[in-house]
Amino acid sequence: GANASQPNLIMVAGRVAIGATGAVGASVGKLFTVTRTAAGLYTVTLDSNGAVPAIVYAAANLVFATGSDTQTVSILTLDATNKKITLQVNDAGTVDTAADPPSGSILQFLILVQNTVSVG
């Protein structure tokens, strides 16, 4: 039979607990690892054996340990070639200034990637 390539979307959803000084704690979800690369900067690496032609969509947010926390999180980079997404947590009082989320917070994200599968 003939082979055809068909784009498929794969959803990767996860969350990680944040400890003291922004340390990455326990995670929930599959197909990713999260590392803290600097204050307020986190890299999500997709655990994919195949190529990732495109990262179609990514979103992230914080669940705070207390109601008085006011930081925000943004997507800095989408790197399909290296299967990585960089997230930056910002201090709400200082725009574009990376800051660790408070201990006890949860960083959660949703990523849609395009993958190519041979059928036929």
Give a label for each model feature.
Residues I55:
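Cysteine-dependent deubiquitinase/ubiquitin-like isopeptidase catalytic cores across multiple families
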